[in-house]
């Protein structure tokens, strides 16, 4: 287990640790239970090594793995909140940290399951629950999230939002988080190495375009099929990378994060204050800026009419290439 980054809690802001968790090879419920124990052990050991730690982040699929033959079975799914999240909550309370965790969630309405992330605070309370808005189709079978993009208070003056893996490839997701007040966007991922460059690029662009910190971490290691790249990354609100991990399983990537600086940039910048300028175009020529929406895709998406010009020619529109049956009905 190695580490990259800072070791101390700043006077203002907070210290975070991103855990490059080794990709779990999970075949049974007993394997999931073992991963939960390992995650809890990691919370306690990381807090012991970094006493000033306030936020610890685990990647997507760290709890239940990526066994695609079983990942939607009743045996593998969890209820949120439920016994598993209760164990995470107890660990966060004991170690006095905020924790970000990945759960493949049983659908309470009996439909397809969700890919879910939660934040638990140092009092052991679940303060945020997010369901992945953009499953990585056609590989993933998860139902598209229905909880929007919530924001919660975090350590050191932070306003936290979480997105999951493929979500971060959509600039609209990061913009939604910022628009709702987030100054720190956490991205938990289970990508294999094919998209590592794009993952790092979008972590930086999401930070820069929205004047917010991004804290991102991926699974690491080999599961017998794919290699997962780790590479925990903390980006400053100006889009520069503050800390970058390597490809080592169990590497701990730490950083001091100063949300107040992002807040100050949003209030004080003129040039490149793009999160504000989007809704106040040309305010020098037009006092207050032009407010009308000029974007066709925004209008069409809002009206449920989004369609790209080449849509009728797109070849892959269902999950059959990965063995999923074509659904007879479209679930809203």
From Swiss-Prot:
GO BP of this protein: putrescine biosynthetic process from arginine
InterPro entries on file: Aliph_Amidase/BUP, C-N_Hydrolase, C-N_Hydrolase_sf, Formamidase
Family the entry assigns: Belongs to the carbon-nitrogen hydrolase superfamily. Aliphatic amidase family.
GO terms (molecular function) for this protein are: formamidase activity; N-carbamoylputrescine amidase activity
Q: Where is the CN hydrolase domain?
A: 14-259
E.C. number:
3.5.1.49
Matching PANTHER family: FORMAMIDASE, NITRILASE C965.09-RELATED
Gene3D superfamilies linked: Carbon-nitrogen hydrolase
Does Hydrolase show up as a keyword for this record? Answer: yes
Q: Which organism is it from?
A: Bacillus thuringiensis (strain Al Hakam)
- Which residue pairs form cystines in this protein? none
Q: Report the protein's function.
A: Is an aliphatic amidase with a restricted substrate specificity, as it only hydrolyzes formamide.
Domain of life here? Bacteria
Give UniProt keywords alphabetically: Hydrolase
The catalytic activity, as recorded, is: formamide + H2O = formate + NH4(+)
Any keyword Hydrolase? yes
Q: What is this protein called?
A: Formamidase
The annotated active site, in chain numbering, is: 60, 132, 165
Enzyme class, first EC level, given as a word: hydrolase
């Amino acid at each position: 287990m190695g580490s990259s980054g800072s070791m101390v809690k700043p006077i203002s802001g907070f210290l975070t640790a991103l855990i490059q968790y080794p990709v779990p090879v999970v075949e049974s419920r007993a394997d999931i239970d073992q991963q939960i124990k390992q995650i809890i052990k990691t919370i306690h050991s990381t807090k012991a090594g970094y006493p000033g730690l306030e936020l610890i982040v685990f990647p997507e699929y760290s709890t239940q793995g990526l066994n695609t033959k079983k990942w939607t079975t009743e045996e593998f799914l969890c209820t949120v909140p439920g016994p598993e999240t209760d164990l995470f909550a107890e660990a966060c309370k004991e170690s006095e940290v905020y924790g970000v965790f990945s759960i493949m969630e049983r659908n309470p309405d009996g439909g397809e399951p969700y890919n879910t992330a939660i934040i638990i605070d140092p009092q052991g309370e679940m303060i945020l629950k997010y369901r992945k808005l953009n499953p990585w189709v056609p590989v993933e079978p998860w139902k598209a999230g229905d909880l929007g993009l919530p924001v919660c208070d975090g350590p050191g003056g932070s306003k936290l939002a979480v997105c999951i893996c493929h979500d971060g490839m959509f600039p609209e997701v990061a913009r939604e988080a910022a628009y709702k007040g987030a100054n720190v966007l956490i991205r938990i991922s289970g990508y294999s190495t094919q998209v590592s460059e794009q993952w790092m690029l979008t972590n930086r662009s999401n930070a820069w375009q929205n004047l917010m910190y991004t804290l991102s971490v991926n699974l690491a290691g080999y599961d017998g099929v794919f290699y997962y790249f780790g590479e925990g990354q903390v980006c400053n609100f100006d889009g520069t990378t503050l800390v970058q991990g390597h490809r080592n399983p169990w590497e701990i990537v730490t950083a001091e994060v100063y949300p107040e600086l992002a807040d100050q940039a949003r209030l004080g910048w003129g040039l490149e204050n793009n999160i504000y300028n989007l809704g106040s175009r040309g305010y020098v020529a037009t006092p207050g800026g032009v407010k009308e929406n000029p974007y066709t895709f925004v209008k069409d998406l809002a009206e449920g009419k989004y369609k790209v010009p080449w849509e009728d020619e797109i070849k892959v529109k269902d999950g059959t290439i990965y063995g999923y049956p074509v659904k007879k009905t479209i679930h809203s």
